Amino acid sequence: MTDFEKKDGFIWMDGEFVDWSQAKVHVLTHTLHYGLGVFEGVRAYLTDQGTKIFRLEDHTNRLFESADAVNMEIPFSREKFNEVQKEIFKVNNLKEGYIRPMCFYGAQGMGLRADNLK
């Protein structure tokens, strides 16, 4: 099992690549308490043409459709999400792997209302 405290590399969070150890979420994050968030599971494989993400467009579209279903506005375009998913393998020197793009509400407020959160 991986010891995540000792892991190195980068995570894309809030629109920028941050060091693994700096990617932290507050304990009062709305999604942690109420479960309102969306995610995908995306796999990349090493091919003769380099690293390729399996059905990237389908995964990204599904993420955005899931967000739309719960009235969650994603502050990035689908194109940006696709770029970042490709880039995360490069910045971490990975040829293959699994990533979990997720969108969640932060700790700007608590309570059942989520229409005022980001």
Where are these regions (language model features)?
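Conserved alpha/beta cores of soluble small-molecule-handling proteins
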Residues: 1-118
